[in-house]
Amino acid sequence: MEELEQGLLMQPWAWLQLAENSLLAKASITKHGYALLISDLQQVWHEQVDTLEVSQRAKELNKRLTAPPAAFLHHLDEVLRPLFKDSAHQDAAHPSKATFSCDRGEEVLILRVRSELSGLPFNWHFHCLPASSLLVSQHLICPLMGVSLALHSHVRELAALLRMKDLEIQAYQESGAVLSRGRLKTEPFEENSFLEQFMVEKLPEACAVGDGRPFAMNLQSLYVAVTKQQVQARQKHKGSGEPQTSSSTSPQGTDSQLQNQPEQQISPTPTLSEPECEPMAASGPVHRAQLVKAKRKKPRGLFS
């Protein structure tokens, strides 16, 4: 079942519009079974079954159909995959070959699927129970924290690029260059003012979750990239036998790494441990001169 769990983690969330409501869902289907996660933005639901359960449920729901579990799983994959793949572009012009309905009880969410298999009606019921806190953490909390940190880093890179562009424009102006089209003139980028304006004017619209569709439409590729990175980091630490404290998989580790980076960058001189300092102090003026020379050759930042 590890293949199913990892496959589910690597899938993006898809937006499903049903007659009753809309859902976010992700699924992983193999010849050994399937795993499904569903969320209505209030609760997360989960089901994972093997071939034995698939065979038993297929007999209960489709008495006229006889086929191996792999055939039913393949059909479910064919039914769900296009729906998930094109979730961002669902419209009346591209109706699904299957119909979906959803019933929610106190402790279970049932997603019903009606389709055709070999010319005969095929029904399937996904019986999803409330997901464990571990699953919610693996599929939502940790990936979304990773997405947030990635977007933050992206913004920082763009801000640095804008400052470089402003310096380039200033150099052109100082050399006598003049814009031929005044409408292209821009003011130098001021990050704090930009952030304040964004918080006031753009934030309410930008963070509107709605029914989850904007998230499924705009962040699928980044979500998958983040989860892939986290899976690879876990596999690396599992193979090495080390405790999982890497900054790539731990939000605290990532935050600590970001906090430590500026300290490393502004350090004026290399630090030496005591065993290394003592022989240098006792080695005479030649070694001291070499140390001074090394300090003079220390590279400086571009705008230092």
From Swiss-Prot:
Do the record's keywords include DNA-binding? Answer: yes
Give the location in the cell.
Answer: Nucleus; Chromosome
Which portions of the chain have biased composition (kind: Polar residues)? Answer: 258-272
Instruction: Cite the residue spans of the region called Globular head.
Output: 1-140
Provide the primary localization. Answer: nucleus
Tell me which residues are marked as the site Leu-lock: L120
Keyword Coiled coil (UniProt): yes
Listed name of the protein: Non-homologous end-joining factor 1
**Which organism is this entry from?**
Rattus norvegicus (Rat)
